[in-house]
């Protein structure tokens, strides 16, 4: 039987691309700002 090869980890996603991580740096805040301007429903992963 074949195995699923992609196992996403929630903790890593949160640490890398969560909202609070984005807000820490200037570039991260720019990402949030751009997504707000575009009208994204989800600004960050978590």
Curated annotation (Swiss-Prot):
GO cellular component: ribonucleoprotein complex; ribosome
Stored InterPro entries: Ribosomal_bL34 (IPR000271)
GO biological process, one term: translation
Assigned protein family: Belongs to the bacterial ribosomal protein bL34 family.
Lineage: Bacteria, Bacillati, Cyanobacteriota, Cyanophyceae, Oscillatoriophycideae
Protein name, per record: Large ribosomal subunit protein bL34
Entry keywords, A to Z: Ribonucleoprotein, Ribosomal protein
GO molecular function per UniProt: structural constituent of ribosome
Domain of life of the organism encoding this protein: Bacteria
Gene (UniProt): rpmH
């Amino acid at each position: 039987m074949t195995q699923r090869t992609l196992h996403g980890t929630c903790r890593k996603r949160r640490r890398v691309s969560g909202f609070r991580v984005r807000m820490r740096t200037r570039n991260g805040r720019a990402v949030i700002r751009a997504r707000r301007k575009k009208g994204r429903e989800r600004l960050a992963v978590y």
